[in-house]
């Protein structure tokens, strides 16, 4: 079911910027703010007069001159800034800027961080780079070069299709890794026990064979009777 149409009021007009206040309004505003005559319209002058009257009132009532104290503070700040500049001139090579320029040599002697740098933007040519590399290689001893070659060969070699410093293969390949044997019974003890067992078993076998031979050769067999 459709809703009934809503009754909309008249549309509001577009906002128009407020016109500047008239001269009479300015006078009324000034009169309300500063309680002055309608003819005075200079705001800056009115503010200066108000500050002057308030300063005189404070000086008469409390004996404290605001303007004089502010001038003293300004002079003290100026003197402190001058002392700071003089102190900075004595201590060369400081991080803070000073009024006097410092030569680069003096700054380098006082401040280890201040290093006189060469003009930037200079690029080396390929010939210069190769020449400097040759000089470095000539200065290196033979042992250092051998070590570097060995490290390069080690870095280039592969194992299981990977670098030697890479992760070891997992899964089936990881099952075939050589494991440490568990230390069990020592070998000499095992050998002695095995030999003792063999000796005892051989002695038992020999005794049994001797007994059997005696039983066979005692002359009671039927074959011996038939021969007789």
From Swiss-Prot:
Bias (Low complexity) ranges: 195-213
Biased composition annotated in UniProt, kind: Polar residues: 218-228
A GO CC term assigned to this protein in UniProt: membrane
One MF term in the entry's GO annotations: carbohydrate binding
Result of knocking out the encoding gene: Flies exhibit disruption of the formation of commissural pathways and shows delays the completion of longitudinal pathfinding. The disruption in commissure formation is accompanied by reduced axon-glial contact, such that extending axons grow on other axons and form a tightly fasciculated bundle that arches over the midline.
Extracellular side of membrane: 138-228
Residues passing through the membrane, by range: 121-137
Main localisation: membrane
Region (Disordered): 141-228
UniProt keyword annotation of Endoplasmic reticulum present: no
Residues with attached carbohydrate: 149, 156, 198-199, 205, 218
Cytoplasmic compartment residues: 1-120
Subcellular location: Membrane
Membrane protein topology class: Single-pass type II membrane protein
Summary of the tissues where the protein is detected: Expressed by a subset of glial cells found at the midline of the embryo stage 12 nervous system. Expression is highest during the formation of the embryonic axonal commissures, a process requiring midline glial cell function (at protein level).
Keyword field: Glycoprotein, Lectin, Membrane, Signal-anchor, Transmembrane, Transmembrane helix
One annotated GO biological process: cell adhesion
Function according to Swiss-Prot or TrEMBL: Has a role in intercellular carbohydrate-mediated cell adhesion.
Protein name: Gliolectin
